[in-house]
Amino acid sequence: MRGDRGRGRGGRFGSRGGPGGGFRPFVPHIPFDFYLCEMAFPRVKPAPDETSFSEALLKRNQDLAPNSAEQASILSLVTKINNVIDNLIVAPGTFEVQIEEVRQVGSYKKGTMTTGHNVADLVVILKILPTLEAVAALGNKVVESLRAQDPSEVLTMLTNETGFEISSSDATVKILITTVPPNLRKLDPELHLDIKVLQSALAAIRHARWFEENASQSTVKVLIRLLKDLRIRFPGFEPLTPWILDLLGHYAVMNNPTRQPLALNVAYRRCLQILAAGLFLPGSVGITDPCESGNFRVHTVMTLEQQDMVCYTAQTLVRILSHGGFRKILGQEGDASYLASEISTWDGVIVTPSEKAYEKPPEKKEGEEEEENTEEPPQGEEEESMETQE
């Protein structure tokens, strides 16, 4: 596992080699995943009792889930805004910003929100070209309609590079603007929202639809919430985007020979194990984005240093988990971010953190020939996660 880390794998299309300097096709390898080949490793003793670990996971999820007040406030604001926009679609009157549809996306739609971050995402698809003036006009129209309905409620509206957001005292709804796909070819960078922003909003709709159809199993949602928390508390996991965490959670629970969901404690451990085995390293088959064409592997949005950092952080946490340190990893015993970089002891067992295996090569001087020895993200593929970073 560690032996392959940091080696150049020959770029996107393989490395130069062989007679005539042709290209070897890039063949990704499959990292070791115990749960895909469990039959090959029959148990010689009973499985350990993990009741306390399972209970700790459920308790942590309970602590992370939005409380009833947060849920009520975000539901109320989303419903009001949704209704106002629906009315503008059905009966725009003299309002010139024509709307195709509005869709709920992100963690609110997926049911993976966390407490303390009461933010929901809506995508509004315009029929017209998305000018900055149109976005501001729509934001003002929506907030004015809301104030007319309930003058006592204090609301603020702010425009931003992705659209606008409307906030009450205890909830925020981000409205992400995009346009119908044929309009993407007519954009003027001087007048309209950035095409990357528009494409990201369309991708968020695809992600929400895929999640609803494939990942609505409750164990998947709980695991994703726990992974989001892990990402926040361990800097080594920061490069993992919300969309990568969604796919990783679904993979860990559902991708096994029986096609039956694994138990939460098994799936949580499996996440760390497959990350430690190099699921998101260069040359790995990784996880293919189900919402993009061309077998796009989601981990290629990360730099090589980030891919390595995710791997060595997971390796350290797997060792701590195997020696009973789950409460520390789950954040139930104070700050644990130091565990990924400092030596720790668990029941007399010393765990030494894994070190990075990839060193970024020095900058090449002008005129030097570029070596094709790194695997780069495919050109033209944008980061597939536009949802609120949580």
Curated annotation (Swiss-Prot):
Residues 24-371 form the DZF domain. InterPro entries: DZF_dom, DZF_dom_C, DZF_dom_N, ILF2, NT_sf. Keywords: Activator, Cytoplasm, DNA-binding, Isopeptide bond, Methylation, Nucleus, Phosphoprotein, Transcription, Transcription regulation, Ubl conjugation. The modification Asymmetric dimethylarginine is found at R16. The modification Phosphoserine is found at S52, S68. One of its GO terms (molecular function) is DNA binding. It comes from the Eukaryota. Residues 11-20 have a biased composition (Gly residues). Expressed in brain, kidney and ovary; highly expressed in testis, particularly within pachytene cells. It comes from Mus musculus. Forms heterodimers with ILF3. ILF2-ILF3 heterodimers may also bind to PRKDC/XRCC7: this may stabilize the interaction of PRKDC/XRCC7 and the heterodimeric complex of G22P1/KU70 and XRCC5/KU80. Forms a complex with ILF3, YLPM1, KHDRBS1, RBMX, NCOA5 and PPP1CA. Identified in a IGF2BP1-dependent mRNP granule complex containing untranslated mRNAs. Interacts with IGF2BP1. Interacts with CRBN; this interaction promotes ubiquitination and subsequent degradation of ILF2. Ubiquitinated at Lys-45 by CRBN with polyubiquitin chains by the CUL4-RING E3 ligase (CRL4-CRBN) and then degraded by the proteasome. GO terms for cellular component: cytosol; nucleolus; nucleoplasm; nucleus; ribonucleoprotein complex. This is Interleukin enhancer-binding factor 2. The gene is Ilf2. The modification Omega-N-methylarginine is found at R16, R24. Chromatin-interacting protein that forms a stable heterodimer with interleukin enhancer-binding factor 3/ILF3 and plays a role in several biological processes including transcription, innate immunity or cell growth. Essential for the efficient reshuttling of ILF3 (isoform 1 and isoform 2) into the nucleus. Together with ILF3, forms an RNA-binding complex that is required for mitotic progression and cytokinesis by regulating the expression of a cluster of mitotic genes. Mechanistically, competes with STAU1/STAU2-mediated mRNA decay. Gene3D superfamilies: 1.10.1410.40, Beta Polymerase, domain 2.
